Design a protein with these regions (language model features):
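Ferredoxin-reductase
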Residues: 2-82, 132-134, 157
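FNR/FR-type flavoprotein reductase catalytic core
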Residues: 69-220
Length: 220
């Protein structure tokens, strides 16, 4: 933690039963889609744990969105309250393709965090395909509803009425590729198995690897 910055949590929002978003004053500039490392004092994991920034670069508050998987870091962060402090690194990462092409985000769960930051900051046409257990596990509901992003939400574990962008079951990647502009750039984020599977299916549908950006989450 020698070169870490200390920030104070000023807001805590419970996104769903498993996911919490922590807000703190933005201590530096960053590019949409980047992440920071969070350090826990006294942890055996001295290198810390990386978390994507879920806020936009132009917002006063910076945020990270954490799913509680029962590990040391996620349990600690999801128990934080307003007034607690965090030790963080500066932002890094190159998930953002910095292109003017249409953007297509494909995310599962908290994999939406960096994709939301990029799509919300984009000026070009944007499309989002989001896999969630059910509507109750949706994250960033208010922000997505207020945005101009074309959102397609898939409930994988609970049958829902197919309205307000919701569909049942898992999405078919080949259908996504056929639905979006042919020159689109794809952003894929979620668990490693999810990212690997979606990447393989996008390329199998004829999309060149140079038009795909990926980022995988590891639970801790």
């Amino acid at each position: 933690m020698r070169d870490s910055l200390t920030v104070e949590i000023v807001r805590v929002r419970q996104e769903n039963p498993e996911v919490t978003t922590l807000y703190f004053e933005r201590p530096f500039d960053f590019m949409a889609g980047q992440y920071i490392t969070v350090f826990i004092e006294g942890s055996q994991v001295r290198e810390g744990k990386a978390y994507s920034i879920s806020s936009r670069p132009d917002e006063k508050l910076m945020s990270i969105t954490v799913k509680n998987v029962g590990g040391e870091f996620s349990s600690y962060l999801c128990s934080c309250q307003v007034g607690d402090t965090l030790h963080i690194s500066r932002a890094y990462g190159d998930f953002n393709p910095q292109t003017k092409q249409p953007l297509v985000g494909i995310a599962a769960g908290c994999g939406l965090s960096p994709i939301w930051s990029i799509l919300a900051d984009a000026k070009q046409p944007t499309f989002l395909y989001l896999s969630q257990k059910s509507p109750e596990y949706m994250v960033f509901s208010e922000e997505l509803a207020a945005s101009s992003i074309q959102v397609n939400k898939f409930s994988t574990r609970q049958q829902v009425e197919e309205k307000n962008g919701w569909r049942n079951g898992r999405f078919e990647v080949a259908n996504i590729v056929s639905e979006v502009p042919s020159n689109a750039h794809f952003l894929v984020c979620g668990s490693l198995p999810f990212v690997r599977d979606v990447w393989q299916k996008i390329t199998a549908a004829g999309v060149d690897e140079s038009h795909i950006s990926t980022e995988a989450f590891f639970e801790q």
